[in-house]
Amino acid sequence: MTVAVLIGTTKGAFVMRDDGKRGDWTITGPHCDGWPINHVVGDPHSGQIWAAGGNGWNGAGVWRSQDGGQTWALSKLSNGDMDRWIKSDPEAARIFGVTEVEDAPFTGDLEALWSISSAHGRLYAGGKPGMLFSSDDDGKSWQGVEGINAHAERENWQGGGAGLTLHTILRDDKDPAKLWIGISAAGIFASEDGGATWETRNRRSNEDAAAFHIHAHEDGLTHGSDTEIGSCVHNMIHAGDNLIYQQNHHGTYRSTDGGRSWSAITEGLPSTFGFPIAVHPHDPATIWVVPMNGDMQGRYPPDACAKVWKSTNSGETWTAMTDGLPAQNCFFTVLRQAMAVDQMDTPGVYFGTNSGSIFASFDGGQSWSEPARHLPTVLSVETLTY
């Protein structure tokens, strides 16, 4: 079997492939014309790869490769400032070698895409500001999911530090009608009818409240309550059936009922703050997180010492993993989508940093190597095992 590590960065997508033994890696890129790529996923059956991204200049879109990342085609969902400039000055655009494109369907509504998911023959893509789209033709065309895009509570949603972003999309392996999304900072939403209707799922379990549930943020507002966790969800991972793990702005959580209630599993970690969370593909009780020192303290590893924390009992206890990671003067950030595992029997664990490194472990996190460095800021890491 071969593993491909799919990397989204501020300067395009990269693909890192192994030699079949995860010992010798090659990397290609940057792909996607240097667009900022927030998320890259692949289909192990067809080999297709999709990269979602964009910004105010480029617009928003999904790049698709049908040959493992060698060539790419763009499906644009919204136009950007560059497209307006091309229309206003076609002669200058010709000199720079760019050509006018057709008006994209969601121009004026959508700024960028932040997440993409492939399952059951359908793609979903999440965007900014807090929008969801679907495609049934491998990403060639896209439709808005109005159940969330026209949600009755939408006018009350508040954005996180990066704005109102729909950054996480979870799918149920068995039931294509079930999905969960995370929006910063509106919270978690779930649908069981293919996206037609949605309900919020931010309720705490009935356990006693911990101090970090109720958080006075720098904006002067209180986040979380005696009955709800804070709505600034950073990342979620589906571990099968109704088991979901979540890294929140204000702690790490576990749900055993499909997100209908959340129990805190932060005790034992050095911080309530972090971005990614990953789960073992064959053992739903094994998870990894990378805590940062806090939202206002620099967002780097506590004590400037890189550590990946692992639990083998669904978050009841945690163990720090440090071998091979920077032990001092480490000020990188690991962003919300920048950690993943492959599907091998002994899965590889990978994470990327905003300083451009990819770290990998092939023994469950006990030891780490750095198979890639000096990349642009790493925004996402996913794997494709085939």
Regions found by a protein language model. Name each.
Residues 1-386:
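Extracellular glycan-interacting surfaces
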